[in-house]
Amino acid sequence: MDADMIPKFTTKEEEIDFWKALSLKYKKSYKEAQEELLEFQEGSRELETELETQLGQAEHRIRDLQADNQRLQHELDSLKEKLEYQYAQSYKQISVLEDDLSQTRGIKEQLHKYVRELEQANDDLERAKRATITSLEDFEQRLNQAIERNAFLESELDEKESLLVSVQRLKDEARDLRQELAVRDTRSEVTRMSAPSSPTPDNDKTDSAVQASLSLPATPLSKNLDNAFTSQTVLANGSTNAALTPSARISALNIVGDLLRKVGALESKLAACRNFAKDQAARKNYVTNVNGNLINGDISNYSHSLHTSYFDKARTVNGLDPGDGTHITAPPRSNSPSGLVLSV
């Protein structure tokens, strides 16, 4: 206590009371402080015990956490290695995929170009197809016309074969008539030599018949064919011994000439048909070269072989060749009044 704070006492009792009261005060404060110290020491011991317990728990926890930390560190290292490996693999895979993507894009562009080219080629093929169909329809139309014409020619060939048989018979008849005329010429010559000044009425009739036959055109085949076959039947059967009249002979000769002319016309038709088949074959080859061999060439070959076979068949029937120039004509009038010269 400071000296300035000590009061001044008047008496010693006051001073003793003052110091006695002050000592009691300090004693009381000492007791209170001692009690507080004991309480503090007890609390400190309890707190120390508690702190030691907590420290042990904390150390145990630290050890556990360190173990966990080490374990996690090992896991982290392994995960880092795996991550690095996965990153490397992913980088490689991404590189490969990028290469594949670039190649795929290139292939896609090529496919787009190829598709455009295919579309253009398809358009060209469609146009060529339409042109080919048009050409094929035209060819089929021409082929049908050729088939119809061939059928018509077949019928004419059949008619020609029958006519060739008739011509051969008429040639035989003409040969017989020529021989008969030669005999009649001989007889007429003998008769003329025996009576030169008086010609017979038969010779006059013969001369007039010959002149009439020379002045008249050829008799149509359709009108005189029945007469010719009737005359041939009469000669073949020997139903009459009388000789044919000069007009009948001239009519038969005219029929033979008409038959031969018709045979020549048929030969010319066959030649024209053969030329038509050659034209069709040339057209077929042209269409095949333009459209890529779309038309089979066997049809024209068949048509050509058909015409050739018919043409050869017509040439070989009865040994008659269309180019041999076989004709029967009415010869000019001879110097003798009754002589007739026939040529086959």
Swiss-Prot record:
Listed GO CC annotations: centrosome; cytoplasm; kinesin complex; kinetochore; microtubule; spindle
Gene3D superfamilies: 6.10.250.1080
Basic and acidic residues bias (residue ranges): 181-190
Coiled-coil stretches noted in the UniProt entry, renumbered to this chain: 26-187
Cross-referenced InterPro entries: NUDE, NUDE_dom
Function as written in the Swiss-Prot or TrEMBL entry: Required for organization of the cellular microtubule array and microtubule anchoring at the centrosome. Positively regulates the activity of the minus-end directed microtubule motor protein dynein. May enhance dynein-mediated microtubule sliding by targeting dynein to the microtubule plus end.
The protein's name in its UniProt record: Nuclear distribution protein nudE-like 1-A
Species the sequence originates in: Danio rerio (Zebrafish)
